[in-house]
Amino acid sequence: QLMTSTDIPLEDIYQVVYKMTLEEFERIYDSKESNGNKFIQWITQKDTSILDFMLLAKTNEYIRLKRNSRWYYPSMKIGARMTIEEVAEKALSVNEPKLRDRYLLQAIRALFSLGRYQECINLWDSEVVQLPKDNLMRQLIHPYIAGAEFRVKRSEKAITYFAELGD
């Protein structure tokens, strides 16, 4: 509601962000029909930057879920508009100030899935640490960085991050 309007019921936002599948969201993205949902109405008519972000985020989650399946193999067709590499590239290239922290989270999630741990760490060092400590996106990114540090064999730094996270 802080990014859109207090007139939008939280339930409408919840339905789109947490419940709607990628396929359902793609239909809305393509048709711009709100189906009575005030959040969809807002992002399709008043702030399409949020619409574009939501498509990228839902695509990222869909691909990551497929890649994490025990039945996944690299040559498998996933059925998404873009690859995980393209998701990472797009997330890094968008310079929308009000959504930058959200795009950073998506970039780091995609890069982590690709095993590009040093790039995750570089993003943390160059941008994420500049976000306020109470920023939710920074808090969601932090565990990925702890894991990335561990995977690039910087155990001391990883342990420090894991300790900060209470893990």
PLM segments and residue spans:
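Extracytoplasmic/secretory-pathway proteins
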Residues: 1-109, 113-167
